[in-house]
């Protein structure tokens, strides 16, 4: 076995260890334990993983490794998503950057799809490489791509089944239309942004000479205007859409327009006659109480149009230019150029009454940033009412549990306000809709054209063409929990463990896709398999930068996990952040900000430091500000663990132990009791998905209890003359270290494996990897009767801390020996001083420990208080008296502050009445301790 390196260098072993794990098959499902399945939200094949991916994947991997160590049959299902719209955008942009003149249209459908497959192979390799570098312990032989044959067959089967059940239909309806992508997008892909715009008031002339009495009043109800009008005034933020108006609407109870219910309007600029209709939708108090109705270009107007059977006039082409349904002079104009012409002509005709600034919500596509058009087109839809009702029942009955539980409210809101789902997209990349049309436009749905012809008796003389649209990405993603397990093919289901691994145990994902993906998986899995997709849904916050800003390519604040793991120069980081921008003009600003934040680039931290940082930041219910400084701190933590292991190995050279140690010292009993408690705490934190508390618990045990205290407290025994105590301490040192490595392994797999390989043989532990060792359990060590040891060592720690604080404040050199006088104290204090005299002398560099007799005057000394015991370090030859007076005054002020805090709590009736009795009693005990300390400090101050 190779000797442990003198310094911690993760780059020297992380990649080597991962290759060993994978080649040995340690990540494959195995064992006879209960199944534990985790679904990876498949990352889009649109580039590389970002910190959000690394965040969630680290937590998933910790869960998988933890359960693998507990003997579960673990399956972590990984793969990638084809990401229709996003991928087409990326590949189209790359074609433009290549400068060969190739575009989506010049290549044609087959040629373009071939380019996408080429790019997918490249991107998919990058994603898997990143995941491996992070330490992902998934079975890569089961990795699935949503466009692979098996999941593609599942998509077709799902579509056909829902179509045959009447849940999928084709219809003409308004959809969100992106005129740049030239496809429909979902409501959740639209961002409503408040922007400055205008509100234009326009006269709509009444037809056939109809008039009405128009009256206006001031705020006090006094009449200010009365006149006969032959027009209505309508306000709009989109005057170009008036070319598609098919009605004007007033409230049925609005007395101002009671005589106009059967009237007609001569629509300006077109000459068309449109009716005045009445509908409760109108807000009489807003504006003039008259509303234009454009059913083909407004979602609310569309519903009005359906109620009143109004014609739907589509004004736009797929690129949002004016089509042939408008007067000839507008045809071919961009929508904004058409707006200018409409306003100009209205003004010339004297029909433009007023133009005023107006704040409005503008719908923009989340990918292109373009204004989205409500657009009338033929699309495929899924009826959602029945599916959503069942999906809500499954969550509210507890069959699917959200963690934290408050996310159920978000889920419920979406499910109770659900609309039919538009599943078709006007793209080439994706699962093509399994529907064929004959020349008469009749539609046939089936698994393939041959089945369609056979089912419907269509001979070769009947020409069929397949629908050119593809299904939106989330349609295939909703099948992920069971399509990856072979559904619907019986043989594949048996081979991939469908019956064993569904439902999965937990889904770890962000709140931003609860409806996009989580809800749809619940509905689809229940519909097609009769089961829930997963038992738990652990919702994480979003990763943000150190300033709380969302990480995005356009902001230039994205961090690549590999750059944190392996490091990157400032020049390479700038190049990475400024290349391939959708808005190239942002490059200069991004470069400036990057050079300011990372003047020397990013140092290599290793995968374990990044993983531990992520766990420590994973609080419930909040977004996470990622601070690179934390990663630096946890790199130091890994280094501390490395050095503690080197200490243990050096002090156990040639030793061989087995089994559980039989402790000979209080120090050993204390650390074994702490280990037992920490094992129980760790399991509870895993059960509750409290990775932050898990990291805190393990950090404090490793750094404080083991490295800082046990290693120091063990040195007197290790170097002492009592052989039994020395051997026992060596055994305990190795035993606790090995258990600590197992406790840490799910969070920091690489460093723990490298160290465990050195430690395990000295304990007679067999096995070639820590990842398949048992996770520590409460009761591995019988710690009954160790409570006294815990109390003793806590007392010893308090003594050492108090004296070290005095030495530090007095600036006593570490090597200088001092004398310690003890005053007062209980019988327990006297017994403990006698029992731990050698440790106290060793740890505190004491030349002597003496007790002051009752009534004996203490020399001028620096004082510290531990419980009832006063610790005195004579000042002669150590410090100047003025400095000690200042120190005591400062310490008195600190203790007085603590007393004030205790009194504040105990003086609060709410705290005393509502807090657990043990907590109140603990606070009273703290007050008593602080008061005792204050008395001693004041007495010492008086002596000076």
Swiss-Prot record:
PROSITE patterns: AA_TRNA_LIGASE_I. It comes from the Bacteria. GO terms for biological process: valyl-tRNA aminoacylation. GO terms for cellular component: cytosol. It catalyses: tRNA(Val) + L-valine + ATP = L-valyl-tRNA(Val) + AMP + diphosphate. ATP binds at residue 553. A motif ('KMSKS' region) lies at residues 550-554. SUPFAM superfamilies: Anticodon-binding domain of a subclass of class I aminoacyl-tRNA synthetases, Nucleotidylyl transferase, tRNA-binding arm, ValRS/IleRS/LeuRS editing domain. One of its GO terms (molecular function) is valine-tRNA ligase activity. A motif ('HIGH' region) lies at residues 43-53. Residues 878-944 form a coiled coil. It is found in: Cytoplasm. InterPro entries: aa-tRNA-synth_I_CS, aa-tRNA-synth_Ia, Anticodon_Ia_Val, M/V/L/I-tRNA-synth_anticd-bd, Rossmann-like_a/b/a_fold, tRNA-bd_arm, tRNAsynth_Ia_anticodon-bd, Val-tRNA_synth_C_sf. Keywords: Aminoacyl-tRNA synthetase, ATP-binding, Coiled coil, Cytoplasm, Ligase, Nucleotide-binding, Protein biosynthesis. Its EC number is 6.1.1.9. It holds the Pfam family Anticodon_1. Catalyzes the attachment of valine to tRNA(Val). As ValRS can inadvertently accommodate and process structurally similar amino acids such as threonine, to avoid such errors, it has a 'posttransfer' editing activity that hydrolyzes mischarged Thr-tRNA(Val) in a tRNA-dependent manner. Belongs to the class-I aminoacyl-tRNA synthetase family. ValS type 1 subfamily. ValRS has two distinct active sites: one for aminoacylation and one for editing. The misactivated threonine is translocated from the active site to the editing site. Monomer. This is Valine--tRNA ligase. The gene is valS.
